[in-house]
């Protein structure tokens, strides 16, 4: 019994299919590529461009008809699937209708991603949120729901706002710690209320420290120009007008409070001023001698203005100031020798005793 596939609309055959059409023999054999025979004798093509055909022993030995599986099949035949879509094959259901599957999926069924708009807070909402953030940075679910009901937002929006606010707060705190200067940690007022141990820069006195010589510096500055012009720097330091002749306390002294340190500085300043005047009075007389005798008994009470006014007066006859610096250098050298004759140790001891007495008074 000869069984053939139903006639379908003819399609253009490929080169491979044309070559296969001449390869039939008369021995009831089927020459095809990628073909499978079912139990009922029908053929299934594996590719849309393959040629499928059935053969059976014809009584006249004629070549069986060749049919190409194109866009589909009808009746009992199952043909190659879809011509252009590239999807599944066309399956016949035996009623003359074919059911096919589309190769391309439908993307319209997928739900589109919902776009969330940026939440805009009103000033009243921000004030309420900031007030609650000041209370706690980590509100629980109940507190967030309560806040959401008050401000008219959802709980998720309130939670996101607190997360962003915490991140901003942490970033600001980190930036503040990085750029904070050491001076910002000190108190605003200058002096401490009670004496406290200070740094070495306040307690140690050095020979080149000019903080204890404000009046002497002013005296040197307000000297007459003709006196400072011809006076060498080392001779000025021998007279006591420079910082090199400061009656410095040894650095090995114990640390004291800031108030005691200032008192010692004032004592040293007063003693340095008195000593400098004593040195100048040894080579002068007249107004300089009277001014020295007036200020010599007391250690305090000396002002820079009075000293500068006294020193700015014309020089006495016994200390002539001429264009040549020889006479002035000799007189200053003699004063320096007399300065060396005084006991620096005794002056230091007197300063310490005076500072101790002042400390006892203020205690």
Swiss-Prot record:
It is found in: Nucleus. GO terms for cellular component: nucleus. Signal peptide: none annotated. Residues 48-119, 300-328 are annotated as: Disordered. GO terms for biological process: neuron differentiation. Residues 114-173 bind DNA. Transmembrane segments: none annotated. PROSITE patterns: HOMEOBOX_1, HOMEOBOX_2, OAR. One of its GO terms (molecular function) is DNA binding. Residues 69-97 have a biased composition (Gly residues). Keywords: Developmental protein, DNA-binding, Homeobox, Nucleus, Transcription, Transcription regulation. A motif (OAR) lies at residues 342-355. Residues 300-313 have a biased composition (Low complexity). PANTHER family: HOMEOBOX PROTEIN ORTHOPEDIA. Belongs to the paired homeobox family. Bicoid subfamily. Involved in larval skeletal patterning. This is Homeobox protein orthopedia. It comes from Heliocidaris tuberculata (Sea urchin).
